[in-house]
Regions:
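Extracellular/periplasmic solute-recognition and catalytic clefts
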Residues: 71, 91-94, 159-169, 191-256, ...
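Aromatic- and charge-enriched surface segment that lines or borders ligand/interaction sites
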Residues: 32-78, 95, 101, 110-111, ...
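N-terminal lobe/hinge region of extracytoplasmic solute-binding protein
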Residues: 1-38, 69, 151
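Surface-exposed binding/hinge segments that line
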Residues: 46, 82-135, 157, 273-276
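Gly/Pro-rich hinge or "lid" segments in bacterial periplasmic/extracellular proteins
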Residues: 20-25, 119-184, 189, 199-200, ...
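Ligand-site clamp/hinge motif
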Residues: 48, 144, 174-225, 360-366, ...
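A structural "hinge/loop" feature
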Residues: 1-9, 29-30, 57, 111-124, ...
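Structural transition elements
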Residues: 156, 272, 288-333, 351-360
């Protein structure tokens, strides 16, 4: 199963800790505490008692030790988090059934947050030693419904998966309920549907065939709510949505000419009108980010400390054009820059099923074209979008 696949992190694989974006606190879950020494190079983890895997085996320090050592031994660095663990961890030591000490190669104040706390989609997945100990981690699929695989510590188990839906059923013997840590979740069955484009999601939600959905426009939300009063947003009034922790961006491949020239990339940034993107693509449900950092209250001191690096929400097309022309490009009769017989172009890839990213891409294309760059926007499938980003198969991509 994919570590980021639909529902696995929410239902099956529980984290040690969870970052609460509203309070800026790191809350404990399977982990009871993870504290550092004064030098920040020795971290001590204490696991909550009574945690069990879904097959009844106890979750202990042995599972943590086994997982970390597996990642440290991965010479290919192809396993999730193996490169990070090899960068930071010198060794791990078991100190009792529920305690592990991490000895780091150098101080890391973010060790707990970066690797053992859920921030968005998930965190490091801890492996059950009693199943994985005699398996080859590079080939073992960990999927066999007859054996109940995959297992986790979560309150649900995977019961079926297909191209269009993933189904989980509640485990009434979940450790959290048995130990009194948390009550059983209300839903007895959770279904993740692959809905495709926004129109499909909106129709399903309006007909009460979806209980939760994401990535829809303001117009679509208001239409759904007019048809189905049970649909609510995070906030009762504009801007309705909770601010995502990842500001959106246009990533430009700096290995492809002429965009390998930082002055040319700076020109793009100057030409982009971020305020217009918010108005058109987001229908004023967001605001331009000043930096690459999300503007949560806890981040304010850091953002205020770099005011000299704040990004202007309005465009400066003339300054952008000056940078382009200083690199030898001349505006042609068709309105686009040319040099040595070639037009200045930029192809922008977007996620076909992500209406938000597509709309942002559309606005950027028009802004760049108006300034003399022959920009195009190509919507591709999510799997291709992810692969192209990972392997640099793009000129530019709207992402985060």
């Amino acid at each position: 199963p994919s570590p980021t696949g639909p529902g696995m992190n929410q239902c099956v694989w529980e984290p040690l800790f969870i970052l609460n974006y509203e309070t800026a606190e790191i809350e404990s879950w399977i982990g009871e505490s993870l504290t550092a020494n004064q030098a920040l190079d020795v971290w001590t983890l204490t696991i909550r008692p009574d945690v069990e895997w879904s097959d009844g085996e106890p979750f202990t320090a042995d599972d943590i030790i086994f997982t970390i050592n597996t990642l440290l031994a991965d010479d290919t660095q192809s396993l999730g988090d193996s490169a990070s663990m090899q960068q930071w961890v010198k060794r791990v030591e078991k100190v009792g059934l529920l305690k592990v000490i991490f000895y780091l190669k150098s101080p890391n104040p973010r060790f707990k947050l970066d690797y053992f706390s859920v921030r968005v989609g998930g965190s490091m997945i801890i492996l059950p030693e009693h199943i994985w100990s005699d398996k080859d981690p590079s080939t073992f699929k960990f999927y066999d419904p007859k054996k109940g695989w995959p297992i986790g510590t979560g309150a649900y188990r995977l019961v079926s998966t297909s191209m269009n839906e993933v189904v989980f059923d509640r485990r009434d013997d979940w450790w959290g309920a048995k130990s009194g840590f948390q009550p059983l979740p209300e839903p007895k069955r959770l279904i993740w549907l692959i809905t495709g484009v926004e129109e499909n999601r909106a129709l399903l939600a309006a007909n009460s065939e979806l209980d939760s959905l994401t990535d829809i426009t303001l117009c679509a939300f208001e239409s759904i709510r007019a048809q189905n009063s049970n649909i609510v947003a995070w906030k009762d009034e504009m801007p309705y949505a909770w601010l995502d922790p990842c500001p959106r961006q246009l990533s430009v491949n700096h290995t492809i000419p002429p965009w390998d020239n930082p002055k040319m990339r700076k020109a793009i940034s100057l030409i982009i009108d971020r305020q217009q993107i918010v108005k058109i693509a987001y229908e004023d449900t967001s605001f331009p980010s000043k930096t690459i950092l999300v503007e949560y209250p806890a981040m304010k001191p850091y953002i205020d400390a770099i005011q000299d690096l704040w990004i202007d929400p309005k465009s400066n097309v003339s300054a952008g054009r000056q940078l382009i022309e200083a690199e030898g490009w001349q505006l042609g009769s068709n309105g686009y820059y040319q040099k040595s017989g070639e037009e200045l172009s930029l192809n922008i890839q977007t996620h076909a099923a992500a209406i938000e990213l597509r709309r942002v891409g559309d606005v950027i294309v028009e802004q760049l074209r108006s300034a003399g760059i022959l920009a195009t926007n190509r919507a591709i499938t999510g799997a291709t979008w992810q692969e192209n980003k990972a392997f640099g198969k793009f000129e530019a991509v709207v992402d985060w």
